[in-house]
Amino acid sequence: MVVVAVSGQPGSGKTTIAREIARVLKVPLVSSGTLFREMATKMGIDFLEFHKYAESNPEIDKSVDTAAVERAKAGNVVLEGHLTAWVVRPYADVCIYLKASPEVRARRVALRDGKSLEEAYREVTEREELNRRRYLAIYGIDIKDLSIFDLVVDTSFLSVNDAVRISVDFTCTTLSFKYSKKVC
């Protein structure tokens, strides 16, 4: 019953890494960010504005996190999201945190979302601060405390392939030792 949690900063490569780990392990990927985006779209609210809205409506985060915990308890899943690893740590075999400089993350988000570099920079830094405040208020979790993670990867100067290789190799090695058999 393999459970891998991938968390990190906006634009750090969480979804890319989590998707590849899920592919290698042949398990589903559950993305908290996708669920959060879907909720914003249903309410007709801009994604960044929805983050602000969620700050005064903790039930939004709690519903997303409850879904993540339920999937983790069921096992055989890769979970991805900003807070995911902290929430599912008791059930996770491996927790990975991805980070990158604000400039690099802004460049990635600008390319991914078709935004200006300035707009993307504002978004990644503002989202990170909104997330930090929200998670501290709702759960008492400081997302700057990375002590729960088995692996922390700075993706600033890594190619996508290198970041994936490091994360997948670590995950496969850890799971093979934990379960005393080749997992990947």
Curated annotation (Swiss-Prot):
GO terms for biological process: pyrimidine nucleotide metabolic process. It is an enzyme of class 2 (transferase). InterPro entries: Cyt_kin_arch, Cytidylate_kinase_dom, P-loop_NTPase. Pfam families: Cytidylate_kin2. It is found in: Cytoplasm. Gene3D superfamilies: P-loop containing nucleotide triphosphate hydrolases. Keywords: ATP-binding, Cytoplasm, Kinase, Nucleotide-binding, Transferase. GO terms for cellular component: cytoplasm. ATP binds at G8, Q9, P10, G11, S12, G13, K14, T15, T16. One of its GO terms (molecular function) is ATP binding. It catalyses: CMP + ATP = CDP + ADP; dCMP + ATP = dCDP + ADP. Its EC number is 2.7.4.25. Belongs to the cytidylate kinase family. Type 2 subfamily. This is Cytidylate kinase. The gene is cmk.
